[in-house]
Amino acid sequence: MSDAKNNLLLFFDRPSEPCFMQKGEENAVFEIPDNYYPEKYQRVSNAIGNRFGSDAGRMIPIRNIALPNLDLPMELPYNEQFSLFVPKHRKLAGRLIDIFMGMRDVEDLQSVCSYCQLRINPYMFNYCLSVAILHRPDTKGLSIPTFAESFPDKFMDPKVFRQAREVSSVVPSGARMPIVIPSNYTASDTEPEQRVAYFREDIGINLHHWHWHLVYPFDAADRAIVNKDRRGELFYYMHQQIIARYNVERMCNNLSRVRRYNNFRAAIEEGYFPKLDSTVASRAWPPRFAGTTIRDLDRPVDQIRSDVSELETWRDRFLQAIENMSVMLPNGRQLPLDEETGIDVLGNLMESSIISRNRPYYGDLHNMGHVFISYSHDPDHRHLEQFGVMGDSATAMRDPVFYRWHAYIDDIFHLYKYKLTPYGNDRLDFPNIRVSSVSIEGGGTPNTLNTLWEQSTVDLGRGMDFTPRGSVLARFTHLQHDEYNYVIEVNNTGGSSVMGMFRIFIAPTVDESGKPFSFDEQRKLMIELDKFSQGVKPGNNTIRRKSIDSSVTIPYERTFRNQADRPADPGTAGAAEFDFCGCGWPHHMLVPKGTTQGYPMVLFVMVSNWNDDRVEQDLVGSCNDAASYCGIRDRKYPDRRAMGFPFDRPAPAATTLSDFLRPNMAVRDCIVRFTDRTRQRGQQG
């Protein structure tokens, strides 16, 4: 049975090549029944079977089953783009997920996959199979290969693929040199936004966004797939943290904080030319010229007819709900927005997911915002153009307007947070616990974080359809930091040991013009670095915590992991949560870039009472190392407090951060120093 489970992963290998061709390290071939072959191959099915089966490393017989009705998923042409933001595509994907989830065992799933893989749009097939593997009880131990392995065309310069085809055809597998991806290939230095392209176009960051939306889909026939613990709040918090991080990166590069996209009638000043090609659609991703305005959509092919005024109506209804602190339900009654669950209700309304309390009334503001922007170059399909990068969760974060749109959405959520009662001492204090200091120790100067460029390699071999087999490595440049430790001095004046929840954040200290931030501005720029629980015994305690253990990030190896390197066998605890573990902020982007002279920031630590924060649950074998932005699979979010606590609410009594401090908190001024040099991955220093 575990063999059949592993066979499912072969469908991710060279996704546009038919599954009767050799797949994976073992050159496995699916032996499919004659009636499964598409019409174009049916007359030669025997010859095909003999041709690819003769030197196969392993033959996989496929059970001939009565196939479900696939008419709906097959409405999306094989060689089109696929977007979860487009309601029609969402409906087709929801039906296919339903079919995959409904197969009675793994053998039947393998059978229907072999039929679908030859006919269904590869992007949609990959997405639906990934969601099914993540959520079926009998496939939970499987590690889905990273999306950049299957579809590298969504993440890098198309020139790389021409070189890769040349290398794989000419050079034998073991002797291939990595192909270098240029770092700045989408714009010149004349474009100020290009200064933060290293963040927007980072492969790991875009993979994080894609994987988060894979783990938290907003549509499926089975509500349990969508209705996960606090998913609406997590939607708010994960994107809020992205905006905080992006704003800090901008200030490190002498740019102002991102301006909200809040006037839907105004032109979008920023243009974006993605320089990406879609291998499935055989088209270049369309650009958006500077000064483009979103216009009413009328695209019958996508079943979209929507006016810009609809966005404005949905927004106004949303603001009205916050003003009234209650949401209108379909039956006309009001659901109060309380301080415990209000943000979760609003998050699901905003996104909007199928668990939105009233989708017909509050609409689909977040998703349709993406759709309007992504079709701004061809709103009525007269030029037969497909959507731009804002229409795909794997590419949206490359575009500067993504951050402008989400800065506005974040602002709307903050309006709700402003209506909540500020935290009092009862919520902030931890009696008998005093944090006397926090500091950073690393390889060099104390309280200094060091950043630089690093070159790493990713294997494109699995995504190179119709080319000779073997690894094809691409080398790309990304930001990296030297690892460091937090050193926290805590004094427990009580008579017994207690468990504390340590919350570590970092924020800039001065704004674009060099003026110190007010507390209200600074709290919105607080970046969560780590959160962990630890015992505090009576007297003085020195607690050291390694940066590599952050609850926010996943290690480099998991962002770019090779599916063949999965720990342990499927079904064991070591592998059981590996797929969920693919969700997390990339560790190489934990620390902002800083500046060559040293960018001033403030490190903040708070110790709260674990007894107030804890969620009673068994976490054995659970992947909880990146729980801050991703939660834990099949479990509750592992912290009862609001996400972003203690900075999620305003504190009118505090004008500066030092006014806000309690005895169980401490701060330390530190600097982030960037050195403009590049090291190879694996080198130290």
Curated annotation (Swiss-Prot):
Transmembrane annotation, as ranges: none
Key word Endoplasmic reticulum present: no
PTM notes: The N-terminus is blocked.
Source species of the chain: Bombyx mori (Silk moth)
Propeptide: 1-51
Disulfide bonds: C581-C623, C583-C630
GO biological process: defense response; melanin biosynthetic process from tyrosine
The family this protein is said to belong to: Belongs to the tyrosinase family.
Organ and tissue specificity: Synthesized by hemocytes and released into the hemolymph plasma.
Cofactor note text: Binds 2 copper ions per subunit.
Binding-site residues for Cu cation A, renumbered to this chain: H209, H213, H239
Name of the protein in its database record: Phenoloxidase subunit 1
Function: This is a copper-containing oxidase that functions in the formation of pigments such as melanins and other polyphenolic compounds. Catalyzes the rate-limiting conversions of tyrosine to DOPA, DOPA to DOPA-quinone and possibly 5,6 dihydroxyindole to indole-5'6 quinone.
Residues engaged in binding Cu cation B: H366, H370, H406
Localization per record: Secreted
InterPro entries from the UniProt entry: Di-copper_centre_dom_sf, Hemocyanin/hexamerin, Hemocyanin/hexamerin_mid_dom, Hemocyanin_C, Hemocyanin_C_sf, Hemocyanin_N, Hemocyanin_N_sf, Ig_E-set
